[in-house]
């Protein structure tokens, strides 16, 4: 076996291990969640999957495939605050108490995500790759910003 093959095998093994750990952690994080907490966790998982798929579609130059995914992200952002009623914190929820201490700030963060995802929908429908990429980056930035402020580590 060549050094190159050994390196490829090690890389493949490390990738498989990382993925299985990631999926296990996700399953563990969602275990025990019920009701609205489980629903919002599922929406966030779908959102993350949509963002990953959009990245792939950009690489393939398939803006048409981005439209329904960006629409799902936009639609989730619009209804997101309703999935955080008072008293829906505590484990297994990963929601920070800061959401309820600054609910108007949380609503603004969800609206920023809605606006950028809507721009992504518009740009992808128009076939404007540059605008779509910029809107995608802005959408991802709103996710990161919101998680920094409103998600437990």
Located regions from the model:
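The canonical Cys-X-X-Cys-His
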Residues: 139-151
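Extracytoplasmic c-type cytochrome modules immediately beyond a signal peptide or single-pass transmembrane anchor
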Residues: 30-138
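Sec/Tat signal peptide C-region and signal peptidase I cleavage site
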Residues: 23-31
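Bacterial N-terminal signal peptides
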Residues: 12-24
């Amino acid at each position: 076996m060549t050094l190159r093959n050994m390196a490829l095998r090690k890389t493949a093994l490390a990738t498989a291990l990382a993925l299985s750990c990631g999926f296990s952690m996700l399953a563990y994080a969602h275990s025990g969640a019920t009701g609205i907490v489980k629903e919002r966790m599922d929406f966030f998982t779908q959102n993350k999957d949509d963002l990953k798929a959009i990245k792939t579609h950009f690489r393939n130059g398939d803006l048409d495939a981005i439209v329904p995914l960006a629409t799902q992200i936009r639609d989730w952002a619009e209804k997101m605050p309703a999935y955080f009623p008072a008293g829906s914190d505590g484990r297994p929820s990963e929601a920070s108490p800061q959401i309820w201490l600054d609910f108007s700030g949380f609503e603004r963060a969800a609206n920023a995500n809605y606006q950028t995802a809507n721009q992504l929908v518009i740009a992808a429908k128009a076939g404007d790759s540059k605008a779509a990429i910029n809107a995608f980056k802005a959408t991802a930035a709103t996710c990161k910003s919101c998680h920094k402020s409103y998600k437990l580590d």
